[in-house]
A protein has these predicted regions:
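Beta1/beta-strand and adjacent pyrophosphate-binding region of the FAD-binding site
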Residues: 1-14, 31
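Conserved beta-strand-loop-beta-strand element in the redox core of flavoprotein oxidoreductases
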Residues: 191-211, 216
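Dinucleotide-binding Rossmann-like beta1-alpha1 core, especially the glycine-rich loop
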Residues: 48-141, 268-270
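Flavin (FAD/FMN) cofactor-binding core of flavoprotein oxidoreductases
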Residues: 123-133, 241, 303-381, 385-405
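Flavin (FAD/FMN) cofactor-binding and adjacent substrate-gating region
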Residues: 99-180, 185-186, 192-199
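Glycine-rich FAD pyrophosphate-binding loop
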Residues: 23-44
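Central helical "cap/lid" subdomain
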Residues: 40, 209-258
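Active-site lid/adjacent beta-loop-alpha segment flanking the redox-cofactor pocket in flavoenzymes
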Residues: 236, 252-353
Length: 412
């Protein structure tokens, strides 16, 4: 019978980050079990992988900072001489529209936390990002009809933000894990969890094979609730698989100049480039677009809805006036595991000895993943190393009270 010191269930960005952070600081025998045929085929593969610092809670700002630091030094962090992924330092532009005090307030707060930020006015936007319209009014969502814009904007810019390819990143982590002796097993589904005597003893796979372990980490994303049930763990948090829509289109030649990762709070969209700037990826920042619960994460509509596409295109046409309505627009859908209680993840040990969790990331998981991995690995091993975060795991403990927030959206 195969034995491991730790089993991580789920080979997305969270599971592999935990496994890698364990492997790089210990000699533990580690296995990652993934039911899909490739790593990152769940929430991670559909992620826009935007790496931004600004959050309303300071501890999450620090987690984002520490996660992004790993992405910005990816070869050093993974130990790979030629990693597939590399960080795109496009910066992150926040456009709050008519709330003219917001940018200065957030700039002061981020500066106090050690994050490099700037406040940009209309002239700055036009000079640095000529394709972007700094209008402070909301677009016409119904028809997309142009209006007479009002200017005088105050915008907030994260100098060191950007994005990284989510699939390449996950493949790199899997390679780093294997190089360190981690057994990354694909097409391997956990059928049941042995918790005799109130402690994890091992797991049984779909093919009937039994694996012994005293410690199992549930990093199964939208499939996490089934493992709670298998382990007999009562979950007080409302973790809901939620359909999230994204659209993309080719970038036309009319859009000149640099386009940063952008958060248009009036328009309810975020956007960034991809494929060396040749495409635009567009998603929602609205809480109302994070409400579609999915009963079965293996069965949900994976194409974006027509009305969603049109609403977001109206917003994009307003923010990027040179963007024509012509051209093919494509869409896809992925899943967040939304923690409806406070849109923050829950981590750590449960009432069943040896059953640990890392679930409910609510769309924040990618940028936080290296830091989350370090939190969990340090809590298990007691050892610290480079690229660790100083934020204690207790901040996101499964036993904590919900974090109080003004808005339960992906912006948090």
């Amino acid at each position: 019978m195969k034995k491991y010191d730790v089993i991580v269930v789920g080979a997305g960005i969270i599971g592999l980050s935990i496994a890698w952070q364990l492997a790089r600081r210990s000699a533990l025998r580690i296995a990652v079990l993934e039911k899909a045929s490739a790593v990152g085929e769940g929430s991670t593969g559909a992620s826009s992988a935007i790496c931004r610092f600004r959050y309303s809670i300071d501890e999450v700002v620090f987690l984002a900072r520490d996660g992004i630091n790993a992405y910005r030094h990816w070869s050093e962090f993974t130990g790979l001489k030629a990693p597939r992924a590399s960080f795109n330092s496009d910066g992150v532009l926040w456009m709050p529209g008519g709330d003219l005090a917001w940018a200065d307030r957030e700039h002061a707060r981020m500066q106090a936390l050690g994050i490099a930020t700037e406040v940009l006015d209309d002239a700055d936007i036009r000079a640095r990002f000529p394709a972007i319209n700094p209008c402070i009014l909301a677009p016409d969502f119904e028809t997309g009809e142009d209006h007479e814009c009002r200017f005088g904007s105050r915008n907030f810019f994260e100098v060191d933000g950007g994005y990284i390819d989510p699939v390449a990143t996950t493949e790199d982590l899997a390679e780093a894990c294997r190089n360190a002796g981690v057994d990354v097993r694909l097409k391997t589904r956990v059928a049941s969890v042995d918790t005799r005597g109130g402690a994890v003893r091992g797991v049984t796979l779909d093919d009937g094979v039994t694996i012994e372990t005293p410690l199992m980490i549930n990093a199964a994303g939208p499939w996490c609730r089934r493992l709670y049930e298998e382990a007999g763990v009562e979950l007080k948090w409302d973790l809901v698989p939620t359909r999230i829509q994204v659209i993309y289109r080719d970038r036309p030649a009319e859009l000149e100049g640099h386009i940063p990762v952008s958060v248009d709070m009036q328009g309810g969209v975020y956007f960034r480039t991809q494929n060396r700037g040749q495409q635009l990826v567009i998603g929602s920042v609205l809480e109302e677009d994070e409400k579609e619960a999915v009963a079965n994460p293996d069965e949900f509509r994976k194409e974006a809805d027509d009305d969603f596409q049109m609403l977001k295109l109206h917003a994009m046409h307003h923010r990027l006036p040179a963007l024509p309505y012509r051209g093919q627009v494509r869409g896809y859908c992925g899943l967040y595991t939304v923690n409806r209680d406070d849109v923050h993840p829950v981590l750590g040990p449960t009432a069943v000895d040896g059953f640990w969790v890392a679930n409910g990331f609510s769309g924040h998981g990618f940028k936080l993943a290296p830091a989350i991995g370090s939190m969990v690995a340090r809590a298990i091993t007691g050892d610290a190393t480079d690229f660790d975060t100083a934020v204690p795991m207790s901040f996101l403990s499964i036993d904590r009270e919900p974090i109080r927030l003004d808005s339960k959206s992906v912006l948090a």
